[in-house]
Amino acid sequence: MAHRSTLLRSVAAALISATLAAASQAATVLKAPRPVVWQDFLGVNVQFQYFAPDIYQQQMARLDELGLNWVRLTIHWPVIEPQKDKFALSELDAAMEAIKAHHYNTLAYMVGSAPFASSAPPGATGRDQYPPKDFSTFAARMVSLAQRYPQVNNWQVWNEPNIVWLPKEDPAAYGRLLTTTAQALRTALPEKTIVTAGMAYYSQMHSTPGYLLQSLLDGGLGTQNIVAAYHPYSEYPEGDSVPDRDFLVRANAMNNLLHSNGVSQVWATEWGWSSYDGPVEMQRLIGTSGQADYTLRRLALMSALDFQRIFLFNLSDLDERASARDQGYGLLDLQASPKPVYTALKNFLTITGPRLTPTDPPAVSQVPDDLYAVAWSREDGKHLLMVWSASGVSLTFPAINDAIVHDPLTGSRIPLSATKGITLALKPTLQILEWKP
């Protein structure tokens, strides 16, 4: 126990104090730890029941066109039980039937306290953001949902309790909610997978030192066969500070922390960028083109890290019930029409094919300091290099005389040929080089 606590403190320190010097040594020519099958690795967040059936059927059709199968469904307890034992489930029932018809692998999470169950003091605002007075009531409602919707095999307990838990975050209390709910679900439905709440960012807290996921590990998370989840949002695909490459540093440290302490599955259950046009709310304004660019670069990076599954936020834009920023995260607009990010992702998945195997990168000359590259082998034997560099220099590949360079943002496909090795002009956006070894 003492050794584990020392390990936890040392990894937490690495997460907190990733310096420019340390980050500059981080490898940016990456090799994934295992093959990736997009249909199993990449999912999307959805809120089908908050849309008209004709719209969410179109959303599902668009998702099917991408060849993806995993969805993460939001369920707000105050919405489905506005009064004690008075349930409003008709919209959710219909959405769940559509999910069943499409054979989606589904992760559902319930968040927020119903009015009758909230621990909020009288007159408090944001009553749903207070934890329930009785954790067993929350657990019983999740069991009831899991029994009502047997097509859902994965259940997640709350959402972002490191920032959405009034009056302040409480790691011990969330740990009790998780344990109470997991025990109730396993007693009733032992085959279901239990997932921790997706922690905002890397699970750091507003006013409590440390990381909530670390607190759960101290409480035995690694022995409970529970999936760990967090939401690595950042300003840029490479992190909040591009020179520090802090996404790679922090995600690797957190994944290593979790895996080395007994957690077998680590899921990023939200990540992405909004295309909103203001007013500015934490994320800077990047528009629809920036959203497409950032999403592809982050997807390339995440595919090469030790995540077992990731869920992009979000399949669709949201209506005025969400904040201005949160309205714009979708692959699709409110009418289920593709945004540029959807088209770019579809191009990306078409280029890569359904399954990739990690391989060694090709030999190159004069690698720039800001290069990011991930090497893969496609099912047809072709090799792919996902690559970008803000400096926009050129790379020469001495052993490759014929190749194709794909730009998934534009859909362009340009042949390259040279007798002494091709030269590729790098861009700050993702390109994919394809060649036959």
Model regions and ranges:
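C-terminal beta-strand-rich structural cap/linker in extracellular carbohydrate-active enzymes
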Residues: 417-437
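Noncatalytic carbohydrate-binding groove/subsite architecture in carbohydrate-active enzymes
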Residues: 171-295, 305
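Aromatic-lined substrate-binding rim segments of carbohydrate-active enzymes
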Residues: 57-65, 70-126, 137-144, 148, ...
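Short, acidic/polar
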Residues: 50-64, 137-145, 207-218, 292-299
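Bacterial N-terminal signal peptides
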Residues: 10-21
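Carbohydrate-binding surface patches
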Residues: 364-401, 408-411
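Boundary/entry segment of secreted carbohydrate-active catalytic domains
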Residues: 27-63, 68-69, 74
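Aromatic/acidic polysaccharide-binding cleft in carbohydrate-active enzymes
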Residues: 273-345, 361-363
